Amino acid sequence: MVNSNFYRNLGPRKLMAIADFLQDFIEAPKIHEDVAIHDIKILQEASSNDISFLSNIKYSRFLKNTKAAACIVPKDFTGEVNPNTVLLRAENSYFAYGKLIDFFYAPVKSYPAKIMKSAYVAESATIGKNCYVGHNAVIEDNVVIGDDSIIEAGSFIGTGVVIGRNARIESNVSINYSVIGDDVVILSGAKIGQDGFGFSTEKGMHHKIFHTGIVKIGNNVEIGANTTIDRGSLQDTIIEDLCRIDNLVQIGHSVKIGKGSIIVAQAGIAGSSVIGKYCALGGQVGVAGHLYIGDGAQVAAQGGVAQNIEAGKIVGGSPAVPIMDWHRQSIIMKQLINKRSK
């Protein structure tokens, strides 16, 4: 059951209305009994008034005994199903489920077009139409924020920063030396645009190198909680359109991340490395500095990238090697350990 303290249930929704709403994403059988659907639940918990979904085949065993009135399933699903459950077949069942969530629920919390009294907004700052600025937020000189944007409580937007339309900057975010596009989401605690880790050692002293670059973030980007993105040292740090960056990711100075790439939690990318378009870095991946990862390449979780990776390659391990080599290494290592233990 969705907690009503945080989300409003917009139901009940008729099953036929759900099928109509999802018609661009699903194939639905003829619905003879237009039952009222009250909620979305997992297969194990769904009742005869609920709808469910299946995107991971590991859970298909629950379809046999589920009580759900309907279930969104992959288009080619052929497993055993409760005969009372209507199947809505989707090319991408997880995507269809996401659309269904939007049809059923809305956040309780709203953001009126308002600047809270405890917020500080510099006179030279430009705030667009229908924006919300939360308690104790700070917006410094010459900041520009586009229409329909949200700046939540305690966030700091430094001098000269530009943020596009329909941005959502959650609580306690710090943004400096940055130009940010439209439809960007930055989750709580993220730090954008601070100095990178640049020092020169001379006569036993570590001398800080002043960073003159900025951070450029494209359109429709999401940046996770407590992620840190350093501004460029001389060349800018660039996050292109459609990127998704998870929580607790570190992106070093002058890194470039190509369009549509995904970086999972606790990954770290050292300075001046370039990640191509639509790449995927798994959790805890480390990328050394000044490397190039080609378009569409993937690095398995905890991979350590110490050399360039060609476009489309899949690698794993530390140091990272082609994924099949990594699997072979793992098997051989296990065999050696078992042999020594006998």
From Swiss-Prot:
Active site: 253
Keyword Lipid metabolism in annotation: yes
Keyword set includes Amino-acid biosynthesis: no
Disulfide bonds: none
Protein name listed in UniProt: UDP-3-O-acylglucosamine N-acyltransferase
PROSITE patterns per record: HEXAPEP_TRANSFERASES (PS00101)
BP terms from Gene Ontology: lipid A biosynthetic process
Any one Gene Ontology cellular component term annotated for this protein: membrane
UniProt keyword list: Acyltransferase, Lipid A biosynthesis, Lipid biosynthesis, Lipid metabolism, Repeat, Transferase
Pfam families on file: Hexapep (PF00132), LpxD (PF04613)
Function: Catalyzes the N-acylation of UDP-3-O-acylglucosamine using 3-hydroxyacyl-ACP as the acyl donor. Is involved in the biosynthesis of lipid A, a phosphorylated glycolipid that anchors the lipopolysaccharide to the outer membrane of the cell.
Catalysed reaction equations from the record: a UDP-3-O-[(3R)-3-hydroxyacyl]-alpha-D-glucosamine + a (3R)-hydroxyacyl-[ACP] = a UDP-2-N,3-O-bis[(3R)-3-hydroxyacyl]-alpha-D-glucosamine + holo-[ACP] + H(+)
EC number: 2.3.1.191
Pathway: Bacterial outer membrane biogenesis; LPS lipid A biosynthesis
Domain of life: Bacteria
Stretch forming the signal peptide: none
Family named by the database record: Belongs to the transferase hexapeptide repeat family. LpxD subfamily.
Quaternary assembly: Homotrimer.
Species for this entry: Rickettsia bellii (strain RML369-C)
NCBIfam families on file: lipid_A_lpxD, PRK00892.1
Record SUPFAM superfamilies: Trimeric LpxA-like enzymes
EC class: transferase
A GO molecular-function annotation: N-acyltransferase activity
